[in-house]
Amino acid sequence: MVTYAEVEIFLYECHSLKDKRSILKRIKNRLQKDLNIALSELDFQDLWQRTKFGIVTVSESAEIGDQIIQQALELIDFFTEVERTVTNVEIR
């Protein structure tokens, strides 16, 4: 099963695209290291206080895939300098 989430994030402490890249790199590295998922920035590359991630995992069941995505969302929430604003999850 493939589980996919689109996550829009507001970055409070960013004052430039360089700050944004630094924070996103930390989040991306942590998610990939801890959960072994794939993710990419999908939108708002030119805005320094907003971004949209796509997060994908492949698992043997929908339940496991959903658990992994939920763990990823909790991990994103752990970063105090960002706020998740919109989240959509799909299981296929």
How should each PLM-predicted stretch be described?
Residues 2, 40-61:
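Short, charge-patterned binding micro-sites
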Residues 57-92:
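C-terminal structural segments of small proteins and small subunits
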Residues 11-16, 59-61:
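A generic structural motif
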Residues 3-13:
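Short glycine-/aliphatic-rich beta-strand segments at the starts of folded cytosolic domains
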Residues 37-43, 84-87:
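A short linear hydrophobic-aromatic micro-motif
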Residues 20:
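C-terminal binding/interaction regions
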